[in-house]
């Protein structure tokens, strides 16, 4: 129960948390690549996590987390954000939450302490998965995809008019 109250506290303060996190990410030397991203876009990305934290922790499946963080990672990779800096930004996002909770919510009883520990476990589990799937997303962004139908049609046309030999065409497409 207390964990849910703490999540609601985070969601209620999501705008202020997001602003603070965006500033922290832009100032950190470990996340200097993020200076390429407009501040409002950084704040919006943080707000997405903070404002819907309850959903992410309690309702979203691992598949939901995988899908979202792979896409975000691929987008950041395309924007030139290095993987280690993206992972550090995720760690800053988690740590920023903990600083906020230490300021705003202190456990006075064993039950409250249990609630804080429960939230700590849920947050760590969420961010561990976010980091894992972000790395998967970066790896997928680096791998060339399979030949498209257009490439295959072009290859077939080149073979049919004698510009390519069938055997070499397959190897050329695979190597590219």
Sequence positions of predicted segments:
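Long, amphipathic alpha-helical coupling/dimerization segments that relay conformational signals between
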Residues: 2, 6, 62-175
């Amino acid at each position: 129960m207390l964990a849910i109250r703490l999540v609601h506290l985070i969601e209620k303060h999501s705008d202020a948390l997001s602003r603070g996190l965006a500033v922290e990410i832009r100032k950190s030397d470990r996340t200097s690549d993020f200076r390429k991203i407009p501040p409002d876009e950084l704040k919006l990305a943080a707000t997405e996590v903070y404002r819907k934290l309850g959903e992410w922790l309690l309702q979203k499946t691992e598949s939901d987390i995988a899908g979202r963080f792979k896409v975000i990672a691929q987008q950041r990779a395309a924007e030139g954000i290095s993987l280690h800096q993206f992972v550090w930004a995720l760690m800053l996002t988690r740590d920023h939450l903990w600083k906020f909770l230490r300021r705003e919510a202190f456990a006075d009883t064993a039950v409250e302490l249990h609630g804080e520990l429960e939230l700590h476990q849920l947050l760590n589990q969420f961010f561990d998965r976010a980091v894992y799937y972000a790395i998967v997303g970066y790896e997928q962004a680096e791998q060339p995809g399979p030949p498209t139908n257009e490439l295959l049609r072009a290859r077939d046309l080149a073979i049919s008019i004698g510009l390519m030999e069938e055997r070499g065409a397959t190897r050329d497409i695979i190597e590219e």
